[in-house]
Amino acid sequence: MDVIKKEKDFPIYNIYLHFYKASYNYHLIDFMYKYPRSVLKDFAKEQFTSVSTVFRYAKLLIPYFRRYHITFHPFQLELNASEANIRSFFYYFYWNSTRESSDKWPFHIEQKEIEKYIVAFEGIYDITLTIFQKRVFSFWLAINIERSSFRKVRVDNEYKSVISDDPHFNLLKKWSKQINLSFNSDELCFLYRIIYSFGVIDGNAIYENSHAYAHQRQNTCSYRAVENLEKVLQSMFRFSLDIKDPELIFNFIAFHERSYLFYGNPDLFFNRSYIEEMKEEEPRTYHIMEKLKKELQANADLDVSKKLENWAQLFLDYYYVLDYYDLFLTNVKPIKILMGASIILCK
């Protein structure tokens, strides 16, 4: 008798995604993005079924969206949250659903048009983006262009102060004029935030450093979060995080910024709790992370403490920081090992 054995590299994600993409829920979310002025009745018509049938599935999305702090109204097919949060949701939705099929383009706007915009961007910034960076940028560009036609995004004054302090924002304005991108001020500011938070500009020191120093000079919430981390690492591990290094500041600010734009685990299709998994599989590491969380909250100011509430997303980022600097090892109690001669002497 043949035995079916699951290997470690078994592509369970791809198989699950294949079936999920055939579901009503996936098609409904996709429909909501592509036809934002439609209602549930329109979706039922497209699916050649009754409203009551699709409503049974649609109402299951209420708790699904709730975990991302988004309110979903099934009959109206409306999402209520900040526009930055909603756009981030759709970015992760399409990014994760096409991760194994890079040739798939899920948006209305032509991919070739977006590619022309990116070529112009590279020319003005005098950089060459990687394939990964181009894909990230292309997804965000498509989403921002398509959604800005009917719903505007807002950027807070604190972040606008960073933009005002960064002279390289003028390059983004120059680029938008060159390609005739009809973004208002907030839309362009939001795109700037995306470019620096999602690694589009990563690897280009002149822009990274300028952005990091702008955050530092403006003493933003993200920069204070990095300062808070530095203090806690010093007190918990006697480790000095070099927050004078602009590249480090840039990267650490970036993951905090991403957590401000979207609440929860960005892997939308597997509702995994890395915290619970670690609690079960690596209890010692879990307890260190829990202590880190408590120390971060205890030392944070009110605004930073509020941002730390998105621990479900920040957990992995902070874990990677501790792992990168081998700080889990420094928390191990030393074990005395006696050599044979020492044992004899002790008798």
Regions found by a protein language model. Give the residues of each.
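A cross-family "folded-core" feature that marks the main globular domain of proteins
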Residues: 1-347
